[in-house]
UniProtKB/Swiss-Prot annotation:
GO terms for molecular function: large ribosomal subunit rRNA binding. Disulfide bonds: none annotated. PANTHER family: 39S RIBOSOMAL PROTEIN L10, MITOCHONDRIAL. SUPFAM superfamilies: Ribosomal protein L10-like. Forms part of the ribosomal stalk, playing a central role in the interaction of the ribosome with GTP-bound translation factors. Keywords: Ribonucleoprotein, Ribosomal protein, RNA-binding, rRNA-binding. Part of the ribosomal stalk of the 50S ribosomal subunit. The N-terminus interacts with L11 and the large rRNA to form the base of the stalk. The C-terminus forms an elongated spine to which L12 dimers bind in a sequential fashion forming a multimeric L10(L12)X complex. This is Large ribosomal subunit protein uL10. GO terms for cellular component: ribonucleoprotein complex; ribosome. Belongs to the universal ribosomal protein uL10 family. GO terms for biological process: translation. The gene is rplJ.
Amino acid sequence: MALNLQDKKAIVAEVNEAASGALSAVVADSRGVPVAAMTVLRKQAREAGVYMKVVRNTLARRAVEGTEYECLTDTFTGPSLLAFSNEHPGAAARLFKDFAKENKDFEIKAAAFEGAVTDADVLATLPTYDEAIARLMMCMKEASAGKLVRTIAAVRDQKEEAAA
């Protein structure tokens, strides 16, 4: 479909706005993936707070100029599906990683976080806020139990020395 200049400018502005407010970005190739599966992916992306759009490579390069995702311009070859995570840095990577397990033709090209290209698997394994809090609480709980055991052992040792 031919796009006139106004449509191209609108697409660039829309993607640039999404990139400016995003926490991370993922680029993927969706060649060979059935339309029904892509529709499901788009629905899951909306639910996860992920902005997703298929953009021409030239327009994608222009859209990410001046943003922290300019490092992704080398990956814009072939069909490019852009996804920007708005709520959690690992949301798009996690979504794409799960989708790639079910659809063998779906390929994750690259991911970016804080202005640098990074491995999508690393982004996908980032804990959510609630998971991070739970891990922190577990560590604190384990540390206090360890201190209690050491304190009781020290008291026992003191009593044994006093009795001897």
